[in-house]
Amino acid sequence: MAKKYDAGVKEYRDTYFTPDYVPLDTDLLACFKCTGQEGVPKEEVAAAVAAESSTGTWSTVWSELLVDLEFYKGRCYRIEDVPGDKDAFYAFIAYPLDLFEEGSITNVLTSLVGNVFGFKALRHLRLEDIRFPMAFIKTCGGPPSGIVVERDRLNKYGRPLLGCTIKPKLGLSGKNYGRVVYECLRGGLDLTKDDENINSQPFQRWRERFEFVAEAVKLAQQETGEVKGHYLNCTATTPEEMYKRAEFAKELDMPIIMHDYITGGFTANTGLANWCRENGMLLHIHRAMHAVIDRHPQHGIHFRVLAKCLRLSGGDQLHTGTVVGKLEGDRQTTLGYIDNLRESFVPEDRTRGNFFDQDWGSMPGVFAVASGGIHVWHMPALLAIFGDDSCLQFGGGTHGHPWGSAAGAAANRVALEACVKARNAGREIEKESRDILLEAAKHSPELAIALETWKEIKFEFDTVDKLDVQ
């Protein structure tokens, strides 16, 4: 060993930059946007990312002789310039599948976005996309139910699901919370939702909320003859408490529960998804904290990666932004990660931000949830953008109706059904949106009032995180 081992430090690119490498079908591929420190060659920066996110460290170590480094190392196989950015570049890295525990999104992210993000040779680093190989996808549970099964359980077909978040999201007692749920569901919504930060606070303990909500859901079902539901947030201080809440929701015969998957963590989320699969429950996923990670265009993790990871970890619905509402997200980027939630195969398409072909095989799809600053005037655009396999959630756009939540729900239901009918008749619903809504309002005073109330409300701000295309 003494003859073969050369102690010291050598450049990362000598080992981890391999431009002649052809990725294998079983490799996990990642695209990083890198901005190195001044004077550090691109090849060295890219190789450092490959090394520090796989087998490498800053020094040559004797124990490398005990490992087949050529088999296990990550390899930067391509570098591309970023359009319109003279400092940043894309590094494409291939990782052998044996570096990762089967079915563990936690383990994948610990490697790819772990210590390397604090590396001094980098000014900025962003994980833009991942190509998960089919060999890894087959080890993941994925959505507990998926789009088709969820529609069957809710008996909703041919249109998006319609919902809302209960407002005010904090401060209501359990009984008053249940009352608001009932008003929304009897007014015409399919589903209502806990907000992401409702857990079990002093003003409203979780068990009290669950009981009053269950009463409201069942009463609304009896009155309307429709299947109704409410996303009961089971996110908790410990996994044990999370499962306790999920079990109680099942005892109450509720169809769907909810989890904050980023703040709760992927280990907890995968466990809860497995529980839902075994117990016949639907799982709604909120993305609270995502913008801390994904909004900066130079540093962090793009939401398309977080969306892919959620589909693998498990969830039947995921918040994706709205394009037209109050939250960040342009149309093409949003469509790109919605495709990765719902489709069985998504081709590389830089105009949608997809850097790789992604084959999902037979893994069920995830409903895209549009929520945040939307109202009846947005309905035609939302239907055109998100299509039928989505859930449109109007919080303030329901409860802010001058006649109350039931009237707000009715207005949204009439608007949605009018847009679906117009689309099915071949009309261009975005171009004819005003005419479609005003025609429907002639037969719905609730919609007429909603259109008047929200006519001046727009969220026209430039997108911070734009696609890097010329």
Curated annotation (Swiss-Prot):
Q: Which SUPFAM superfamilies does the UniProt entry name for this protein?
A: RuBisCo, C-terminal domain (SSF51649), RuBisCO, large subunit, small (N-terminal) domain (SSF54966)
> InterPro entries annotated for this entry?
RuBisCO, RuBisCO_lsu_C, RuBisCO_lsu_C_sf, RuBisCO_lsu_fd_N, RuBisCO_lsu_N_sf, RuBisCO_lsuI
Question: What's its catalytic activity?
Answer: 2 (2R)-3-phosphoglycerate + 2 H(+) = D-ribulose 1,5-bisphosphate + CO2 + H2O; D-ribulose 1,5-bisphosphate + O2 = 2-phosphoglycolate + (2R)-3-phosphoglycerate + 2 H(+)
Which residues make up the annotated site Transition state stabilizer?
326
Q: Which cofactor does it need?
A: Mg(2+)
- Tell me what else is known: The basic functional RuBisCO is composed of a large chain homodimer in a 'head-to-tail' conformation. In form I RuBisCO this homodimer is arranged in a barrel-like tetramer with the small subunits forming a tetrameric 'cap' on each end of the 'barrel'.
- State the name under which the record lists this protein: Ribulose bisphosphate carboxylase large chain
Species source reads Prochlorococcus marinus (strain NATL2A)
